[in-house]
């Protein structure tokens, strides 16, 4: 499981996240996927989650299982409440996002190589999950900070950390060169 220790659902539920996309990214670290299911049976509407184990490439393996077979705390209603709780917590404590943002920005300044970026972030306790189009373009970037137990879509941290900014950063013509250190004259 991506080099992570054995986990329990309690470990995942400690993380703060504000959207289904952020929750998906967190689950992917533990080789778990999620499908949202909605429908109607006998005139009664239902809404829930179905979880599946995945292999290292994100392909489902084995049979999916309903959230209700695990625990109420991982069902659709509980997770949606978690989104609202997390949004409130992030609004009240801006430090959570600032810690992650500053760490990611510092690492981004060190390299134009995506693999090196991922490696340096991991050393700081942050995982990044990139989502790619069929032709390899980055269309999503989510940062999972294990230090603050917070999950953020890149655009939530700032325009400079959005998927488009990441795509541009990692495909610039000078991607194989070392970044030029920023120097500010002393008289400023």
Regions found by a protein language model. Give the residues of each.
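Extended intrinsically disordered terminal tails
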Residues: 1-188
